[in-house]
Amino acid sequence: MAKGTVGLFDSGVGGLTVVREVSVILPGKRVIYFGDTAHVPYGDKSVDELLSYAERIIGFLCSQGADYIIFACNTSSAVSLRLMRDRFQVPMIGLIEPGAAEAVRLSATGRIGLIATEATVKAGAYARAVSALNRNCQVFSQAAPRLVPLVESGESDTPKAEQAVREYLEPLREQGIDTLILGCTHYPFLRDVIERVLGPEVVLVDPAAATVRAARLDMLRRGFSADNPGAQGEQDTVSLRYFVSGSADAFRAVAGQFLGREPEPVTEICLLR
């Protein structure tokens, strides 16, 4: 079976929450990550812009050897995935369906909250995915446009971030949700703040782990090796290459806060300018 190389992309550092799950669920897998930091945030971009970004990034990832693509961005998953599957032969998976399935599984009351970018909320993909799984579940959606810029500027755990989180979550609290989908891969950077605001009675769903588990099963069905045990006694490692369309230094600084170390190597590439 082919070992394969996984390509992931997001508007910025948020997709690193998915890379982290790849390192656990797909040990030893070669990974190429593209952060489109020149165009972050994606939530206020038009459909045409999002399709253009996705097409160029996926083409680049494939040129670098990726033969399986994980959309590490909810906005692109909601807007671009279906069309990109038509344009490329490489298999792809997005965050929406696995995240919706996890929320339906965990919700006891069927009252599911969603915070996401404006584009993801407008696309309605999570509501459709949840309804397809269980028509008795309701999705209460809230766009949270200020959160991605806060994460990208390294302000995840600040009073400014907590004020914004409280503002966005209050309408969902009033709806009596028992489960909240973190509908943007940047939002796990804010997990501690969100948990403080909502308390333990609301379960948080990060679609990243469910998506990578689904990717692993899909790879096995397609004849890929889902991991790389290597030679006997060889420790599993994840081979990572990072590319960004904006500042490599800015990406390293914010990513280092999340990873506990600065990612290397990070290469700036003028792919989308």
Curated annotation (Swiss-Prot):
Entries under InterPro entries matching the protein: Asp/Glu/hydantoin_racemase, Asp/Glu_race, Asp/Glu_racemase_AS_2, Glu_race
Catalytic activity of the protein: L-glutamate = D-glutamate
GO BP annotation list: cell wall organization; peptidoglycan biosynthetic process; regulation of cell shape
Swiss-Prot/TrEMBL keywords: Cell shape, Cell wall biogenesis/degradation, Isomerase, Peptidoglycan synthesis
Tagged with keyword Endoplasmic reticulum: no
Binding site for substrate: 10-11, 42-43, 74-75, 185-186
Pathway: Cell wall biogenesis; peptidoglycan biosynthesis
Active-site feature positions: 73 (proton donor/acceptor), 184 (proton donor/acceptor)
Lineage top rank: taxon: Bacteria
GO MF term list: glutamate racemase activity
Family, similarity comment: Belongs to the aspartate/glutamate racemases family.
Name this polypeptide is given: Glutamate racemase
Organism, as annotated: Desulforudis audaxviator (strain MP104C)
Gene this chain is encoded by: murI
